């Protein structure tokens, strides 16, 4: 019989760079359509679908959506406690994503430059919401909160590094402080080239950076060399652009290089009907069994 590993504790050991028993794997994002197609037995039961995905794919880390009102209801009712055996991460959209939803992309960029009071008003509402969600997340035995704020593209930030430091970073620091006050780990997500802000994110209190966007030029091993054990990373595997052989080799390389921890291995894109393919089995060997359920 194989070694029984406590999923949550092993992830914590990895985040502390303290030699986990094995490198944890996980995914933060699962679309509803993906869950309904591959886990139809629990259609309409989001928590059970996530639990099934975690069990069948041997995930240690799973993400759950805390943005929608239906999810707030699940939080209030304590339903996410069903996932307590996993290192469960609730994701909350950050101030820039929420501003873009309310104002549009161009107007949000203008606000960052010229109308910071409007942005401040949006953030005030976000902070109140984050406090409530973090309190409930802890009661549901979640392990972490990820601030999801896509603020970069393939060529860098959508605004200047100076604007990030002066305007955006203080908000991120406040959110990290709220997360930590509830004894939760603080994760940060943004696609694109975020290299210029990682040092600032560490200083603001973030424990783990997702997703290590290889298509934007991020190199996991350069990041490891630069930041050492001061932060961890999650993701790294490009299941869209790499072939089976590349994925298998990248997995092996990461397992060899991160034996002391500092990495949660997973895809860079999450699971949707647009991102999954047969190549997924190179990252998650159990995928073939899940696919047969379709």
PLM region spans:
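Active-site loop segments of alpha/beta catalytic cores
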Residues: 2-47, 62-66, 70-294
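Active-site donor-binding segments of glycosyltransferases and PAPS-dependent sulfotransferases
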Residues: 53, 57, 66
């Amino acid at each position: 019989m194989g070694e029984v590993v406590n999923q949550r504790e092993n992830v914590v050991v990895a985040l502390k760079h303290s030699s986990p028993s094995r490198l944890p794997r996980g995914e933060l994002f699962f679309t509803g359509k993906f869950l309904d197609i591959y886990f139809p037995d629990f259609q309409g039961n989001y928590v059970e679908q996530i639990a099934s995905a975690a069990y069948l794919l041997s995930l240690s880390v799973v993400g759950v959506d805390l943005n929608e009102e239906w999810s707030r209801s699940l939080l209030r009712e304590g339903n996410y406690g069903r996932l307590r055996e996993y290192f469960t991460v609730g994701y909350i959209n950050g101030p820039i994503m929420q501003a873009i939803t309310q104002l549009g992309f161009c107007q949000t960029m203008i606000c960052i430059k010229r109308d910071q009071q409007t942005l401040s008003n949006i953030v005030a509402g976000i902070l109140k919401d984050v406090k409530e969600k973090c309190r409930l997340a802890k009661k549901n035995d979640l392990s972490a909160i990820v601030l999801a704020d896509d603020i970069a593209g393939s060529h860098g930030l959508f605004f200047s590094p100076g604007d990030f430091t002066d305007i955006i970073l203080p908000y991120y620091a406040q959110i990290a402080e709220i997360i930590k006050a509830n004894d939760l780990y603080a994760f940060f997500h943004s696609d694109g080239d975020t290299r210029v802000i990682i040092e600032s994110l560490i200083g603001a209190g973030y424990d783990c950076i997702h997703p290590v966007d290889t298509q934007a030029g991020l190199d996991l091993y350069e990041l490891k060399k630069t930041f050492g054990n001061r932060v961890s990373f999650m993701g790294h595997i490009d299941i869209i652009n790499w072939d089976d052989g590349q994925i298998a080799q990248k997995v092996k390389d990461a397992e060899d290089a991160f034996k002391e921890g500092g990495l949660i291995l997973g895809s860079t894109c999450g699971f949707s009907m647009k991102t999954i393919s047969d190549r997924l089995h190179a990252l998650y060997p159990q995928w073939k069994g899940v696919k047969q359920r379709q």
